[in-house]
A protein has these predicted regions:
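Beta-strand-enriched cores of mature, soluble protein domains
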Residues: 289-447
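Patatin-like phospholipase
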Residues: 1-37, 45-293, 423
Length: 447
């Protein structure tokens, strides 16, 4: 079975794809070809540079997202908004982000030239011809890779030898056609571009909607062309249930790489657990998402010791504002020197009396083990609502460990609270205020 991995774009949020790759690697899936467009170029660059999925996750954790932005010469900004070449350039990506992520264009070319190597292709648009080129990994270089992520308005294009190279997103954001041209019998599409019915107001959201329409439209055109040619293949798609936070939230620290990675792992495991050998129908439903119910997202971190060494638990919890609007979502990881970082699969939140529990599975010591982290909440809502939330019991593989939320963890939790699925200022503020006032008692009240 010849498999192609098709990595769609998604900006800096493609940190999510590192979590997906961790799950696929654990399953032993191998690919003979990797294709990438836009932000997916980062994931392909890491894979084709020889990084394991574990290394990819570690490197994303250490990236400073501010390095994605680098300023133009000061004189360019004096031209005024109507003559500004772009908000910034790709120097930060080339000089800081690529090295931090372990992306080495020389290594990519060298590895691609080896006998039996995984094939690679990077989609970049040449503007003078308005044409998308799937540049082979044997011919790619760092400047072209960065150009493939240089969105108009935000980053300047690459000008080279009379040609202008830029992000392919306005033509396509995933190249299934290239995968089929290279003989794929099975295509794994890793998709983190929003695709819900929600239409937002304002220039940023509508700029993103244009990307969504271009990306989804080109994908459907690939499906239709394959069907017209009688080209059969199996399609698997890993995508979030709800659209991921946008890049500005990542850049401003309202979501971080570790959270996106854990979400990617959660979403990949959800698909792997439910997939069939026949894959998915090749239509608009394969990448469709739903809007989350109004609520909040927060980061819950606790620490303890096992065998005299530090144990860290970290969860990202998405909690709807009203019971019946949906179930809470849970993703995250457990970290210990003996086994490293293991991610949560099938995460859920359960309430039993005054006990609030996070439950999930983790792949540990070659097998799946059930994990439960439980708080018993006695205090009434009010100023002391957080005091009894600082202690929890972790159960894993028959072992029980006491974990504690330090003052720094509690402060970080409160600082991490972000509204989700809420689009007006009043609705967003209300969701955050209610949770921060009542703490984890709010979960008991609702669920």
């Amino acid at each position: 079975m010849r498999r192609s991995l098709v990595l769609a774009g998604g900006g800096m949020r493609v940190a999510w794809q590192a979590g997906v790759m961790r799950a696929l690697e654990e399953e032993g899936l191998e690919f003979q070809h990797i294709d990438a467009a836009s932000g997916g170029i980062l994931t392909a660059g890491m894979l084709l540079s020889g990084l394991s999925s574990r290394e990819m996750c570690e490197r994303w954790s250490g990236v400073d997202v501010k390095d994605f932005g680098s300023a133009l010469p000061f004189g360019d900004y004096l031209k005024g908004p109507w003559s500004l070449p772009a908000i910034g350039d790709a120097d930060g990506i080339l000089d800081k982000v690529f090295p931090a992520l372990g992306i080495d264009d020389a290594a990519i070319r060298a590895r691609a030239a080896e006998p039996g190597a995984v094939e690679g292709s990077f989609n970049v648009v040449e503007f003078t011809e308005k044409r998308c080129h799937a540049i082979d990994a044997r011919e790619i270089d760092a400047e072209l890779m960065a150009a493939g992520m240089s969105l108009p308005i935000f980053l300047t294009p690459l000008r080279r030898d009379g040609k202008i190279w830029t992000d392919a997103v306005w033509i396509r954001d995933a190249n299934v056609a290239e995968a089929l041209r290279r003989g794929a019998q099975e295509v794994w599409l890793i998709w983190c571009i929003g695709n819900s019915p929600y239409w937002g107001d304002g220039p940023l959201e509508q700029y993103v909607h244009m990307i969504e329409m271009s990306a989804a439209g080109a994908l459907l055109a690939d499906f239709e062309a394959a069907a017209a040619a009688g080209r059969e293949f199996v399609l698997h798609v890993i995508r979030p249930e709800h659209p991921l936070p946008l890049d500005p939230e990542f850049y401003l620290g309202r979501v971080d790489a570790d959270t996106l990675i854990s979400m990617g792992y959660r979403d990949a495991r959800a698909y792997l657990d439910s997939m069939t050998p026949d894959g998915l129908a090749k239509d608009a439903r394969c990448t469709s998402m739903t809007e989350p119910a109004p609520g909040v997202r927060f980061i819950d971190a606790l620490h303890g010791e096992v065998d005299g060494q530090p144990l860290a638990f970290r969860a990202a919890v998405v909690m709807p504002s009203q019971r019946g609007d949906g179930t809470p979502q849970l993703s995250g990881y457990l970290d210990h020197p003996r086994f490293g970082r293991v991610f949560l699969a099938d995460g859920r939140v359960e309430v039993d009396g005054e006990d609030l529990s996070y439950r999930a599975r983790v792949l540990l010591d070659g097998g799946w083990q059930d994990l439960a982290l439980t708080r018993t909440l006695h205090d009434d809502p009010g100023p002391d609502a957080w005091s009894d939330a600082r202690n929890a019991r972790l159960e894993l593989g028959g072992q029980k460990v006491e974990l504690t939320m330090g003052l720094g963890d509690a402060a970080a939790l409160l600082a991490s609270v972000e509204p989700v699925g809420a689009h007006g200022f009043a609705e967003r503020a209300q969701a955050v205020a209610r949770f921060t006032a009542n703490g984890f008692r709010e979960l008991l009240r609702r669920y």
